[in-house]
Structure formats: C-alpha cells, structure tokens
From Swiss-Prot:
Acts as a protein-folding catalyst that interacts with nascent polypeptides to catalyze the formation, isomerization, and reduction or oxidation of disulfide bonds. May play a role in storage protein biogenesis. One of its GO terms (cellular component) is membrane. This is Protein disulfide isomerase-like 5-2. It is found in: Membrane.
C-alpha cells in the first residue's frame, strides 16, 4: 500500500487567509465610504461622470433626471423632484433622487440612450428602466413606489392587510388573494406589476370576509379604490380563467371616458359599450351608471364606459352626436374607427333602463346592428392628437426661432438644439 503524502494546502490557505481578509475589509470599507458619500436625507443629489458609477454601486434604487440647463420642461420638473425626493427617501425601500447635466456630460447620457430632455430613469441595482409616467410629485411617488414593491406582498395579519391597502393608495387597482396559493398569482404579479398591486393574505379574520364581501376561500378580491368598486373571483384558478379575470379587472366595471382612461383602453382588446350622456355628473346619469355596472359584471367580455357631452363634446361628436341629439344613447365601439348601433335600441328611454340595456346587449350579440365610421380621428389618432398638437406648436416655434437665428447670425454659428421631452 502506497504511503500517503501530506499536501501543503492547509498551510497555503493559512498564509493566504490574512491578505484575503484584509482585501474583503477594504472592499467593505470602500462600499461603506461610497454609501456615506451620497446623502440619504431626501435632497436631490447632483452627479457627474466621475460620481455616477459610484452612486450606482452604493444606492440600490436611484432615480435619475438627465436634464439640460436650457430645457424649459426640465426647469418645471425640478420643483416636483424637490418635493418628491424626501418622500421617496422615506419609503421602506428608499429611492434616492439624483440629476445629471446630460448636455454637459454627453458621453454619460449617450451610454444610457438619452436623446432628449428631460429623460428620467430608475436604476434598480444598477439596471436602468426608463420612466415615462406622470411628473407631478404625488403621482411620481406613487408610480415609483410601485416599481420597487415586491411582485406579490405576503400579508400575515389583519393589520398587515390594512396597511397594504392604505399604502397602495388609489392610483392602481389591487388584487388580494385570501387562501390563495402565492404561486398561482406570482407570475401575474410580475407581468402586471406596473398596472396593479398584488398580495396574498396568509392569515385574516372574518371581518375581512365581510368587508370584501366573500364567503369562502380561495378567493381573489379585486379592488378599485378610486372608483369604489370591488369584485370577487372564486376560480377556477387554472387555465386562462385567472388571467382573464385579472386582465379584465384592471379597468373598473364602468369606465368614465377621459384623456387618462382613454389611454388605459389601449391595453385592452375588448369592445366598449359606450353610454353617451348629456352630463355624466348629474343624478340621472349616476343612476344609469349603477345600472351599467350591474350589466358590466355579467358581461365581462365587454368594457362598459360612459361620457358626457358636457364634459367632452369633442370626443362625443366623433360619433355623429351633437348637443341637440336625444340622449342618453348606447353604442358599441371597437376603440378604433368603427362603432355599431343596435337597431331599435338607439336611445334609452325613461323607465326600466335595466331591461332596455339587456335588450341592447341581446340585439348586439344577435348581430342586429348597423356599423358606422367615426367622423373624427381613429382611437390611436385621437390618442396621438392629445400629445402631438402641443408638440407641433413647440416644433413650429423652435423652427421659427432657428430660422431667425440663421438669418441674423449665419448657419455656421447656429448652436445645436437637442430635443426636449414633453410630459
């Protein structure tokens, strides 16, 4: 039997251990120093090419405004960021707000694809996500808080459920699973992260069954605090049924049509049963909306919306309806260039409007309709017009200004003007 020889590996490790420990300590000290270098007290910090990478390494959630000193939109954004910064820094997952003069540090801006001002990006552990949401301080906080929240929150008590609902606010719908396995909704929590809150309640009292109107588990409760709506899904939790419920519940049962909700419809492929009213804020209209809500709950394959000609006559007139038309009317709109009128159900009369809406839906599903074209722009055209008109005016002014500068100073001396991002 061959004799075994003792290898010097343990001795080598003993010799290497002190320098390895020193190296690790130096890394830790460097990271701590970098973290202390950037204030966490809610101030907006100014970064340059030399400090930017260090900030990415030291700050888990860094919200960066790539700006230009001459940009008017950037100047209007600055006080909103100043207001939002201390609130964001105080979140359970703090977000630090920073700004970079990307007109001066163009190489840094180019690295992250900055081609206009302001460009806003949230860096999550160094990975950039462009932010294109609202720039108002309160909505900015709500939206960014949504970015850093877990895909699905785990709630272990009644107080945790209450805190989750309060902290989520009213900007996004919520889905809370009671007795639902987390794995069933985890994928949807990631897929629809930017559009809704998701949570699973592990432990809860019967009080919440009363509050959210469910009588058995598993149950997935959908909440729309902004519209004071809620609904319950009892399954089945397999196949496409669960995602269909989630996708259809991202919108409230009855959608008030305005510039904000019109954009939300772009992510939904259902047709819209649209009630056109004289004034969507009066008592008669409010009663009709309640009837529409009941119909919407039973017809989830359609979106139910309403709009008042008093509130938005420009939009209503695209359906060949004017202030002299007899209202309310019901149509089915494909969200683009066509809509359908149901024969014999063009106008809702006073009386039993629930029965009239049922007859309207029956006629629509039976194909007793007349198709018409919208008289204005298509859905996408109307959406684009909400933004493009202001952009067009700005571009005209910019080109006019450039023309004057070229005329008086010569083309060679004309400074480069980079594009500004509107909200």
């Amino acid at each position: 039997m061959a004799a075994t020889t003792t290898r010097p590996l343990p001795l080598l490790l003993l010799l290497l251990l002190p320098p390895l420990l020193l190296l690790l300590l130096s890394f830790h000290a460097a990271a701590a120093a970098a973290a202390e270098e950037f204030p966490r007290d809610g101030r907006v910090i100014e970064l340059d090419e030399s400090s930017f990478e260090a900030a990415l390494g030291a700050i888990d959630y860094l919200f960066v405004d790539f700006y230009a000193p001459w940009c008017g939109h950037c100047k209007r954004l600055a006080p909103e960021l100043d207001e939002a910064a201390p609130v964001l820094a105080g979140l359970s997952e703090p977000i630090i707000v920073a700004k970079v003069n990307a007109d001066k540090y163009r190489k840094l801006g180019s690295k992250y694809g900055v081609d206009g001002f302001p460009t806003l990006m949230l860096f999550i552990h160094g990975v950039p996500i462009e932010y294109t949401g609202s720039r108002k301080a309160d909505l900015l906080v709500r939206n960014l808080n949504k970015f850093v929240a877990p895909d699905v929150s785990i709630l272990e008590s009644d107080s945790a459920i209450k805190s989750f609902v309060e902290n989520a606010g009213t900007s996004f719908p919520m889905f809370i699973g009671f007795g639902v396995n987390e794995s069933l909704i985890a994928g949807y929590g990631g897929k629809y992260k930017k559009r809704a809150w998701f949570a699973v309640a592990k432990d809860f009292s019967e009080d919440f069954m009363v509050t959210y109107d469910f009588d058995k588990v598993p149950a997935l409760v959908s909440l729309h605090p902004k519209y004071k709506e809620q609904s319950v899904f009892y399954g089945p939790f397999e196949g496409s049924f669960l995602e269909d419920f989630i996708r259809q519940s991202l919108l409230p049962l009855t959608v008030p049509i305005n510039t904000e909700t019109l954009k939300m419809l772009d992510d939904d492929d259902r047709k819209v049963v649209l009630a056109i009213l004289e004034d969507d804020s009066d008592e008669t209209s409010s009663q009709l909306v309640k009837v529409l809500r009941s119909a919407a709950n039973a017809n989830r394959d359609l979106v139910f919306g309403y709009v008042g000609i008093k509130q938005w006559d420009e939009f209503v007139e695209t359906f060949d309806i004017s202030k002299s038309s007899q209202l309310p009317k019901l149509i089915v709109w494909d969200r683009n260039e066509e809509y359908e009128v149901v024969e014999g159900s063009e106008k809702l009369e006073e009386g039993d409007q629930a029965s009239q809406i049922s007859q309207f839906l029956e006629g629509y599903r039976a194909g007793r309709t007349t198709k018409k074209k919208v008289s204005g722009p298509s859905f996408m055209g109307f959406l684009n017009s909400l933004v493009s008109l202001n952009s067009l005016y700005i571009l005209i002014c910019v080109f006019a200004l450039l023309g004057v500068m070229i005329y008086f100073t010569g083309q060679d001396d004309t400074p480069q003007v980079r594009r500004a991002h509107e909200e």
